[in-house]
Amino acid sequence: MKILDVCCGSKMFWYDKQEPHTTYMDVRKATYTAMDRGNERKIEINPDIQADWKNIPFDDETFDLVVFDPPHLVRAGKTSWLAKKYGTIDLMNWPHDFREAFREIMRALKPTGTLIFKWNEDQIPIKEVFKAFGQQPILGDMRRKTKWSVFIKEDER
């Protein structure tokens, strides 16, 4: 099985941060420190591949599974801990950027590939994200602010 984590960040939800089936990708490669509630915090973003999720540098139909946990903040201070930890998205361009990312992910997925999508609705409702994708998930958690959703690549025949 080949897995791609498109926006790995600091690999927060991975139990094994060097999971052998997984290629970790992120546009950022950096170590940040910031104050968070009076404590200095450090976050290291060290992907295997540094690339933008709107231009995934892999051949068509490479991965069985893609994990997509993109930044969800349009409003965050540039030096804030949350902005450094999660990254931010552009208020005006995020729908276009997400549409492009979704197309790229589907291109990189094998015909029976699966997309696991994670989202936090704190600033943008998940329905708006699905509208940008142009596709509904087959299942997902709709009860909390943070959403996990699973997509299957559609057969193009």
Where is each model-derived feature located?
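Class I S-adenosyl-L-methionine-dependent methyltransferase catalytic core
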Residues: M1-R157
